[in-house]
Each structure stands twice: as C-alpha cells, then as structure tokens.
C-alpha cells in the first residue's frame, strides 16, 4: 500500500514521529496493517551500526533487504532510521516503485544543538545513545531531503524541537490523509508509483535466482543425507553429484541439523553479498557449485 521513509539527524525525534504516525494510521481505519522497521527491530545497536563506513553500509543493506521483503499493496511500512544519504533514499523509492505503491518522506527538521542536547539527556538517563564522535560524524554527512527530487517527494516536514510531535500534529494528519486516501481516475493529489518493465524484470530475475538456490542447496543436502544413510553411520569421504559438478568431500559424518544450519547461513550470506555485488546465480548448476565449495571449506575447517 505504501512506504514511508523517516528522515532526520540522530536524536531528532524520528522514532517519536514514526510511533505517532503508526498510531494515527491505525486509528484512521481498523483493517490497516502498519509495521515499523528500525535498527532495534533487527537487534542492531546504534553505535555498533555506525562505528565505521563498512558496518554502516551493511546496516543499510540489511534494512533495505527487510523493506524489500515487507512492502506490499496490503500494508504500510515505516522505515525509522537516519536515511541520511539521498542515494539510499533513492534505493528505497525504487523498491516502492517496483511494488506499485505510494511513497513519501517524513522529515524531522531539528536543529543540531537540540539533537545534541537530546542525545546528552538520553545518556544521563541510561537510554540508548550515540557516542559523541559517531554523532558528530553522522551530523556532518547528513543530506537534507529536497522535495524537488522524486525520491524525496512528497515531503512532509515536522519541527519536533519547536512544535513537538503528537499523534494529532497537523503534519501527521496530512501524511495519514495522503497514505489512506482512496485513489480513482479523478485523484490528482495522491501518486501511486508505477513499476517499469526494468524493475519488474529485475524482481523476477531475483526471485528466480533465490528459487534456484533454494532448490539446488536442498538437493545437495538430500544427496549427503542419502549417502551417509547408505554408509550405515560410517564417514563417507566423497559424494559425487554428477558430471561437471564438484565432489563433496567429507572428513567426518555431518548430521542433518548441522547441514540445515550451514544451508541457512550460505543462503543468508549469498543474499547479503548480492546487495553490493552481483545477484545470486540464476541456474541450478552454478548454485550447486557455490554451495559445495562452501560446504567443503566449512566442514573441513
């Protein structure tokens, strides 16, 4: 139905805005599904997630992946994070466009001095905060949204330090109206993004890749289990999967729970790698080769 990107400096009132928006949306209609995606919902700490550029990039990848899995035409997803880089907001906009849903940005425009003060007060209360050096770094790299950019539009602006943030705030009400208004041929003030052929093809290709990887890795697991059962519990050193495919080399017997755990980890790693590199293999043989190489390394180590 919609994707809402919360944007602002650290400690600018974003989480309060996300909570108020979600509550106002749920109050507007009883059959609406609203979900907030943030670092804490994924068990990620603030300082650990922003301590350097590598982990920050990984954080954005994890959040983007979770948004990609969650967006649909039946729910409203609220991304409560810094979303401080315009290129990243563009990526989120592309996800909304590929899903054919509404999109908007809710910007918490809070002066840096107030953000710093709120961060200090949280430290005094023992609440989760940003270390001072991390806070200063994030502030210096913030890219303010611009409503002239399609990925920053429509833009709803809140001023938490001046007006506070409440469920009844006029800007919250305006955003709720935009997100829930019924759209017909006469509607002009609400824009539902339309997927392009390119985005539809990309999502289909990714789905096919994940299907092939899931299928191929399960077949490898089945082959190992069958070979070990035929060996009556004795170690099976080598398992052939057929011509032009690598041989599975086992130094010991491997139980089904361990095999399942290795398979889950492999699929997770392949998905994370595809966020910054090439997509997962689209054919079964390539997926099989990758998984067998991974198993041979992990089991022999």
From Swiss-Prot:
Classification via InterPro entries: KTI12/PSTK, P-loop_NTPase
Alphabetical list of Pfam families matching this protein: KTI12 (PF08433)
Keywords from the named record: ATP-binding, Cytoplasm, Nucleotide-binding, Nucleus, Transcription, Transcription regulation, tRNA processing
GO cellular component labels: cytoplasm; elongator holoenzyme complex; nucleus
Keyword Zinc: no
Calmodulin-binding: annotated span: 262-275
GO MF term set: ATP binding; calmodulin binding
Binding site for ATP: 8-15
PANTHER family for the chain: PTHR12435
Its biological purpose: Elongator complex-associated factor that is not a structural subunit but rather transiently contacts the complex. Regulates both meristem activity and organ growth; acts as a positive regulator of adaxial leaf patterning. Required for an early step in synthesis of 5-carbamoylmethyl (ncm5) groups present on uridines (ncm5U) at the wobble position in tRNA.
Summary of subunit composition and partner proteins: Interacts with the elongator complex. Binds to calmodulin in a calcium-dependent manner.
Protein name, entry field: Protein KTI12 homolog
Source organism: Oryza sativa subsp. japonica
């Amino acid at each position: 139905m919609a994707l809402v990107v919360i944007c602002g400096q650290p400690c600018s009132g974003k989480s309060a805005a996300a909570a108020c928006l979600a509550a106002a949306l749920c109050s507007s209609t009883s059959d609406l599904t609203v979900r907030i995606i943030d670092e804490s919902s994924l068990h990620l700490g603030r300082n650990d997630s922003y301590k350097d550029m590598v982990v920050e990039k990984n954080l954005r990848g994890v959040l983007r992946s979770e948004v990609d899995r969650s967006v649909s035409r039946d729910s409203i997803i609220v991304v409560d994070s810094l979303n401080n880089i315009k290129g990243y907001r563009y990526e989120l906009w592309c996800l909304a466009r590929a899903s054919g849903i509404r999109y908007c940005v809710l910007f918490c425009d809070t002066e840096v001095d107030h953000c710093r003060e709120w961060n200090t007060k949280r430290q005094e209360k023992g609440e989760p905060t940003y270390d001072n050096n991390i806070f200063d770094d994030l502030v210096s790299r913030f890219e303010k949204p611009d409503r002239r950019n399609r990925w920053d539009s429509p833009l709803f602006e809140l001023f938490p330090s001046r007006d506070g943030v409440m469920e009844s705030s006029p800007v919250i009400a305006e955003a709720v109206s935009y997100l829930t208004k019924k759209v017909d041929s006469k509607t002009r003030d609400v824009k539902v993004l339309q997927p392009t052929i390119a985005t539809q093809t990309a999502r289909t290709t990714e789905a096919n890749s994940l299907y092939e990887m899931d299928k191929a890795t399960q077949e490898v697991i089945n082959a190992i289990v069958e070979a070990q059962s035929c060996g009556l519990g004795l170690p099976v050193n080598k398992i052939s999967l057929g011509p032009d495919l690598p041989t599975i080399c086992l130094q010991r017997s491997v139980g089904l729970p361990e095999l399942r755990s290795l398979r889950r980890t492999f699929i997770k790693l392949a998905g994370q790698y595809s966020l910054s590199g090439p997509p997962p293999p689209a054919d079964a043989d390539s997926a099989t080769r990758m998984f067998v190489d991974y198993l041979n390394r992990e089991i022999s180590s």
